[in-house]
């Protein structure tokens, strides 16, 4: 007998269970397992996956939602993911499939906008290959001259930031339009207003979290797991805990292409050396008169050190840096292994006993001779 099926999007993964937003049968997410044959072939299921689901009898018979917060889930209430459709994009950190864009959120102030941190986020976002939407929050706390300064500065970097204020909802409509009908990831440092922005973009987000997590965890808004939330005008949005402390997991030769202003310089021309890393090599196509060139050099050293950790270790000077009560740093000699280690009393007694025994043996041998 052919089982009834529907297609949908995986919106959350928790242990061995998957929440799927179905397209036709119900407007509520359905709790599912993964078919054994998918496990056997090593087919993983990720948030954002497009899947085909075998529907549970209870849903077909009663037409009810499967997300009521009950303490146990009966076998007949579970759907089963039977197929995972090919993915258009895949991210490992955070683990999300089929994402289309990353929305980076920063604050213009409180905390102050820090150019190195912003640059690092942008570089890692570029490495995903996804479209980037840059959003500056807290417009209501700065002067118009500050807004213009950062707008002009980011334009030179190759970006057109969306300026918003969650507090007075200024500029939010433009961001909503960018998110419409797409799977988007939201990332950024702490304290910039991401949670408040998500609450504004996704009305009832706390209830969505409660529904999705009612059977499996306590039902509070946490970003330890990636979850997709429905946007009112279409599309899905995820907060991304794995992206909020970005690593530069790129190849050295790839790094220059993650800076739009440098990428533009390489359009239609090449460096003389194929392995050029754009550090002043002869006939390099990339100039040095762009603002983030220093960022590029610093990030490049970090990437090179990751590839050759044995070469990046500094020679041991025998000193270690410590911070005093006055906040000043100072060097203190390291204690060499075993050289300055105090012997334990037990060890001293053992050595003394061994010495006495050896002395007695020597004396005994002398008496015998």
Swiss-Prot record:
Q: Does the keyword Membrane apply?
A: no
EC number, UniProt record: 3.6.1.-
Q: Boundaries of each CP-type G domain copy?
A: 88-246
- Which regions span the lipid bilayer? none
What are the names of the required cofactors?
A: Zn(2+)
Q: Name one GO cellular component term.
A: cytoplasm
Predominant subcellular localization, coarse grouping: cytoplasm
Q: Which intervals carry biased composition (Acidic residues)?
A: 359-369
Name the positions where GTP binds.
Answer: 137-140, 188-196
List the subcellular locations: Cytoplasm
Q: Which InterPro entries does the annotation name?
A: G_CP_dom (IPR030378), NA-bd_OB-fold (IPR012340), P-loop_NTPase (IPR027417), Ribosome_biogen_GTPase_RsgA (IPR004881), RsgA_GTPase_dom (IPR010914)
Q: Please share the entry's free-text remark on the cofactor.
A: Binds 1 zinc ion per subunit.
Q: Which family does it belong to?
A: Belongs to the TRAFAC class YlqF/YawG GTPase family. RsgA subfamily.
**NCBIfam families, per the entry:** PRK12289.1, ribosome small subunit-dependent GTPase A
| Task performed by this protein | One of several proteins that assist in the late maturation steps of the functional core of the 30S ribosomal subunit. Helps release RbfA from mature subunits. May play a role in the assembly of ribosomal proteins into the subunit. Circularly permuted GTPase that catalyzes slow GTP hydrolysis, GTPase activity is stimulated by the 30S ribosomal subunit.
- What PANTHER family does the record tag this protein with? SMALL RIBOSOMAL SUBUNIT BIOGENESIS GTPASE RSGA, SMALL RIBOSOMAL SUBUNIT BIOGENESIS GTPASE RSGA 1, MITOCHONDRIAL-RELATED
Descriptive protein name = Small ribosomal subunit biogenesis GTPase RsgA
Species, as recorded: Synechocystis sp. (strain ATCC 27184 / PCC 6803 / Kazusa)
Taxonomy of the source species: Bacteria, Bacillati, Cyanobacteriota, Cyanophyceae, Synechococcales
């Amino acid at each position: 007998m052919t089982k009834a099926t529907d297609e949908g999007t995986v919106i959350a993964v928790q242990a061995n269970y998957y929440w799927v937003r179905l397209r036709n049968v119900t407007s509520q997410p359905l709790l599912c397992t993964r078919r054994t044959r998918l496990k056997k072939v090593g087919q993983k299921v990720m948030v954002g996956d497009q899947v085909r689901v075998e529907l549970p009898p209870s849903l077909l018979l009663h037409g009810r939602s499967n997300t009521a917060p009950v303490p146990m889930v009966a076998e007949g209430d579970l759907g089963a993911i039977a197929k995972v459709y090919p993915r258009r994009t895949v991210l490992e950190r955070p683990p999300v499939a089929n994402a289309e864009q990353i929305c980076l959120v920063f604050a213009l102030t409180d905390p102050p906008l820090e150019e190195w941190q912003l640059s690092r986020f942008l570089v890692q976002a570029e490495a995903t290959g996804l479209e980037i939407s840059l959003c500056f929050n807290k417009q209501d706390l700065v002067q118009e001259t500050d807004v213009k300064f950062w707008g002009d500065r980011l334009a030179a970097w190759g970006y057109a930031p969306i300026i918003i204020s969650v507090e007075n909802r200024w500029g939010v409509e433009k961001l909503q339009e960018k998110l419409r009908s797409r799977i988007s990831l939201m990332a950024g440092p702490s304290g910039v207003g991401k949670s408040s922005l998500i609450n504004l973009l996704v009305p009832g987000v706390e209830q969505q979290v409660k529904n999705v997590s009612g059977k499996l965890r306590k039902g509070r808004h946490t970003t330890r797991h990636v979850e997709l939330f429905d946007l009112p005008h279409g599309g899905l949005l995820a907060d991304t805990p794995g992206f909020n402390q970005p690593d530069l997991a790129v190849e050295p030769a790839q790094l220059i292409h993650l800076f739009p202003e440098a990428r533009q310089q390489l359009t239609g021309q090449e460096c003389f050396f194929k392995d050029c890393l754009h550090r002043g090599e002869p006939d390099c196509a990339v100039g040095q008169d762009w603002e983030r060139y220093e960022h590029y050099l610093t990030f490049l050293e970090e990437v090179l050190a990751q590839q050759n950790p044995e070469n990046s270790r500094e020679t041991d000077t025998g000193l270690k840096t410590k911070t005093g009560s006055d906040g000043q740093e100072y060097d203190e000699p390291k204690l060499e292994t075993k050289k300055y280690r105090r012997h334990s009393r037990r060890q001293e007694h053992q050595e003394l006993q061994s010495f006495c025994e050896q002395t007695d043996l020597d004396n005994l041998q002398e008496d015998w001779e």
